[in-house]
UniProtKB/Swiss-Prot annotation:
Domain of life: Bacteria
Keyword Ion transport: no
Predominant cellular place of this UniProt entry's protein: cytoplasm
GO cellular component: cytosol
Keyword Manganese: no
GO molecular function: ATP binding; ATP hydrolysis activity; ATP-dependent DNA damage sensor activity; damaged DNA binding; single-stranded DNA binding
SMART domains: AAA
An annotated GO BP: DNA repair
Keywords: ATP-binding, Cytoplasm, DNA damage, DNA recombination, DNA repair, DNA-binding, Nucleotide-binding, SOS response
Compartment annotation: Cytoplasm
Species of the source: Herpetosiphon aurantiacus (strain ATCC 23779 / DSM 785 / 114-95)
Name this polypeptide is given: Protein RecA
C-alpha cells in the first residue's frame, strides 16, 4: 500500500534531519543499500569456502578459539599476511607479549609494516584498539588474546585478591563501544580466545571461553580450531592437521568445517589445501596413489603432489583460480581489501558449500 503524500513529506523531513544530525547513512531504506559482504582471505582455501563469503567478513567482530597449540595465532597471522598482500594495513595487539616476528615472517607477514602493540593492561589494549578502529585506516586488528586482557585493578592489586567478573565487565563495555565503530570503519576485528573448563558440569560440554558472554553475542563469526593429528615424515613430526568448525556465522550458513595442514616453521600449507579441495571439487583427480590435473601427473602420494605444486607456483596459482571459480557463489563473492575500498560487493553465497553442514 502506497504511503500518503503527507506521511511521505513528514518522513522525508525526519530523514533529512537525521542525516544532518548524525551523518549521511545513519538511516536508509534497505533498497538504498546494496547487501554486500566484503571479505579478507584466511590463507586457507578450504576455510574460505567453509565461511561462505571467501574469507572473514569486514566490518565485523570475529572470535577464534581453541585449545593450546591448535593454530589460533597461526591462522590470524595468515589473515594478516593476506591483508598486506592486497594492500591493506594490519595491527596486532599482543596482550600475551609472545609475538614471534620470525615465525610471523615465515607465515608471509611483512613484519616491517605490521603495527604491533604490547599493552600493560586490558583497558590500555582495548583503548588502543578503539583508536585504531575509529581511525578508519586499519583493515584488520588482531587481539591476542582475550584471556590476557587483565584489568588494571587486578594488576595493581595483590596476589590472591578476588576480582570476580572484572574481565567480563571490561569486555562487555568495550564491545558495546567498538561494535558500531567496527561496522562503520569496515575493520575486521579478530579476538583470539582460550578455553577453560567449567567446574562441576556432569552433562554437556564443560568447555567455555574466557571473558564472559559478551563476545559470543557480538561476534558475527566464531571459529573453533582444533588439532586433529600430527603430520609425520618418517619419525619426525613436521606439522599438524587442523580442523576448523564455523560455530557461528551471521553472513553465511554456519556449522561447516574445513581441514588443512599447519607445517611447523611455515604455517598453513597452501599446496596441501589445493590438493585436498581440488580433489573434493573434482578439479584434481586421484587414481590409486597418483594425483592428476587432467592427464598430467602431479605426484605419487599427497606429500609428493604438494611438493610438485610448491616447485611449480604458477601451476598452483592456476589450480587455485579454478577452485575459486568453481566454488559455490564464486561469481558473487567478492574479496576486497584496503582502507579506501568501496563499500560494495556482491551478496554472500547462501547455497550449499562443498563441505557438509552438520
Amino acid at each position: 500500500m502506497a504511503i500518503s503524500p503527507e506521511k511521505e513529506k513528514a518522513l522525508a523531513a525526519a530523514l533529512s534531519q537525521i542525516d544532518r544530525q548524525f551523518g549521511k547513512g545513519a538511516i536508509m531504506r534497505m533498497s538504498d543499500q546494496r547487501l554486500s559482504i566484503e571479505a579478507i582471505p584466511t590463507g586457507s582455501i578450504a576455510l574460505d569456502l567453509a565461511l561462505g563469503v571467501g574469507g572473514i567478513p569486514r566490518g565485523r567482530v570475529i572470535e577464534i578459539y581453541g585449545p593450546e597449540s591448535s593454530g589460533k595465532t597461526t591462522l590470524t597471522q595468515h589473515i594478516v599476511a593476506e591483508t598486506q598482500k592486497m594492500g591493506g594495513v594490519a595491527a596486532f595487539i599482543d596482550a600475551e607479549h609472545a609475538f614471534d616476528p620470525v615465525y610471523a615472517a615465515n607465515c608471509g607477514v611483512n613484519v616491517e609494516d605490521l603495527l604491533v602493540s604490547q599493552p600493560d593492561t586490558g583497558e590500555q589494549a582495548l583503548e588502543i584498539c578503539e583508536t585504531l578502529v575509529r581511525s578508519g585506516a586499519i583493515d584488520v586488528i588482531v587481539v591476542d588474546s582475550v584471556a590476557a586482557l587483565v584489568p588494571r585493578a587486578e594488576i595493581e592489586g595483590d596476589m590472591g585478591d578476588s576480582h570476580v567478573g572484572l574481565q567480563a565487565r571490561l569486555m562487555s563495555q568495550a564491545l558495546r563501544k567498538l561494535s558500531g565503530a567496527v561496522s562503520k570503519s569496515r575493520t575486521a576485528l579478530i579476538f583470539i580466545n582460550q578455553l577453560r573448563m567449567k567446574i562441576g558440569v556432569m552433562f554437556g560440554n564443560p568447555e567455555t571461553t574466557t571473558g564472559g558472554n559478551a563476545l559470543k553475542f557480538y561476534a558475527s563469526v566464531r571459529l573453533d580450531i582444533r588439532k586433529v593429528e600430527s603430520i609425520k615424515q618418517g619419525q619426525d613430526v613436521t606439522g599438524a592437521r587442523a580442523r576448523v568448525k564455523v560455530v557461528k556465522n551471521k553472513v553465511a550458513p554456519p556449522f561447516r568445517q574445513a581441514e588443512f595442514d599447519i607445517m611447523y616453521n611455515e604455517g598453513i600449507s597452501r599446496e596441501g589445501n589445493i590438493v585436498d579441495v581440488g580433489v573434493t571439487m573434482e578439479i584434481l583427480r586421484k587414481s590409486g596413489a597418483w594425483f592428476y590435473l587432467g592427464d598430467d601427473r602431479l605426484g605419487q602420494g599427497r606429500e609428493n603432489a604438494k611438493q610438485f605444486l610448491k616447485d611449480n607456483p604458477a601451476l598452483a596459482d592456476e589450480i587455485e583460480k579454478m577452485i575459486r571459480a568453481a566454488s559455490p557463489g564464486a561469481p558473487t563473492a567478492k574479496v576486497i581489501v584496503g582502507a579506501a575500498a568501496a563499500n560494495g560487493a556482491a551478496p554472500a553465497d547462501d547455497g550449499d558449500g562443498i563441505f557438509d553442514d552438520e
